[in-house]
Amino acid sequence: MAVALDRAGLRRVSRMAMPILIVSGVAADLDLLSYFGGANAYLHYRYAVLHSIVGAPILAVVIALAFWLAARRNQAAPLRFSRVLLLCIIGIGAHILLDVATADGVQLLWPFRARWFSWDLLSGVDPWILAVLAAGLLLPALFHLVSEEIGSKKKRGRPSKGAIAALVVVALYIAARAEMHGTAVQTLLAQDYHGATPLVAGAFPDSASLFLWRGVLDTKNTIEVVSVPVGGSDVFDANSSLTHYKPGSSPAIDAARNAPLAQEFVRYARFPLADLENTADGYRVTLRDLRFPQDADTPDNLIAVIELNANFTLRAQGIQFASEQESRSR
């Protein structure tokens, strides 16, 4: 994305536009390093610290200062701080906008409010966007080499039509995904599932298919998971949904829901489901988010584990990566 923005015309803002856009375009993901602090730290800080309305502006200023100060050593070609800062804002803003468009979401209001913003339009790494950007950058470069071979004059500094076209196509693609997402949600809400009426529905992108969505819907007693085809030749079948039964009310479930970490996890999870099991000296309640398949090998697939004693008093609580629990259970 940074290279496309540079070649689409932002290189005219500064001679260092490309490196500035590249650095600012990836720097926000430094908060993903919280992964190495464990699942609990990852839940708290990823897509938050440097993706928020507080962290992102500070990050833009820090990066702009770094480039500006480095350029001051070259007295013959200094950089204007205002232009560098503008490029940093564009780079970080484009990055955060794409993250908001994913199903993972962003904690824009961190640290003031633990609320996730997500449009559920794109997978974390969308192969179709990557393909469009690559085509928009590589094909003009190939044509340029051919034109040089036949003696055409090289035009320097002009915006690349290929890069502009690629950015326009990406914008149209996201708009089309928004339309498809709305259709998927309406399709989910228009059906009954094994006799149950949906209360809330969500549609999440399938990275392998343009037309298939992971549908998840909440009914009074169950959470249903079903594939939703949109725009293709397949027909939606509500009866093919996989049913997950919610646990009934019990002292153990009620006590687990009141645990501080469980409440924080529920703010993160879109479709939380609790599983209750007896232990030697009490109870264990596991919360997972059905937005993700159970075997989804992504660090965003988190679970909360609440341990209670026989008197339903909180004994331990923690966040885990679902992939680690799956490995231990094998």
Predicted regions and their residues:
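Extracytosolic and intramembrane catalytic regions of membrane-associated proteins
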Residues: 197-200, 207-330
